[in-house]
Regions:
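Short, surface-exposed coil-to-beta transition loops
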Residues: 24-27
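FAD/FMN-dependent oxidoreductases across multiple families
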Residues: 20-22, 46-124
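Hydrophobic residues embedded in beta-strands of well-ordered beta-sheets
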Residues: 37-38
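Short, surface-exposed acidic
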Residues: 8, 68-73, 176-177
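A short, hydrophobic, proline-anchored segment that marks a local hinge/packing element in signaling
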Residues: 31-34
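C-terminal helical "tail/cap" subdomain of flavin- and related membrane-associated enzymes
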Residues: 122-177
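Central beta-strand plus flanking loop segment that forms part of the substrate or channel wall
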Residues: 1-15, 68, 79-82
Length: 177
């Protein structure tokens, strides 16, 4: 929470301040909730785990960069999203399901999963209500897995291209996407 109002509380910052350094590809999400409340997420896209003290340093720098060095922290989360994991063998039987991260819900090249998990949960609940069967998380199509694998291999081999590649992708999206 910021003691002074945000510059534009109606503007969301997605993948801002992108840069590549010795710890990987870094960017920020800034999601305002009101004139003075916001969520600031510092994200690292890297094949190696980044030490938490480095992430704390990155967060302090982001707060200062946005002019929020006097903000009051109300809640903190931290986590690691494993990306590019091999697809797990799906169990058989009406009472078993693999879902979420282990079920392949995370898009390997982006880390996004929320919409896929929500859609799976809805169809799984409907299936349970209709015939008592639990559904596993559906796999991404082979073409998507191939493209994401190619993208991740490119980033591993040439990590300095991260900001440029993500900006190129973002430039081709509409606001609704």
């Amino acid at each position: 929470e910021s003691p002074s109002p945000l510059e534009d509380p109606g503007c969301v910052g997605l993948m801002e301040n992108m840069k590549q350094d010795e710890h990987g590809f870094l960017f920020h999400y800034l999601l305002p909730f009101s004139e003075n409340r916001f969520l600031l997420e510092v994200t690292r896209f890297t094949p190696e785990k980044v030490p938490w003290d480095r992430m704390e340093h990155d967060l302090a720098g982001a707060l200062e960069g946005y002019g929020f060095s006097h903000a009051v922290e109300k809640r903190r989360e931290k986590g690691i999203l494993p990306m590019g994991l091999p697809t797990q063998k799906q169990p058989t039987g009406p009472r078993w399901a693999i879902a979420g991260t282990r079920g392949g819900a995370i898009r390997p090249a982006t880390g996004y999963a929320f919409q896929r998990i929500a859609e799976w949960a809805e169809s799984c609940a409907r299936s349970i209500a209709e015939d008592g069967c639990v559904l596993s998380q559906p796999c991404f199509p082979r073409s998507i897995r191939w493209m994401d694998d190619l993208f991740l291999r490119l980033l591993r081999g040439k990590p300095e291209l991260g900001p440029q590649l993500f900006m190129r992708f973002a430039g081709r999206l509409s606001p609704g996407q």
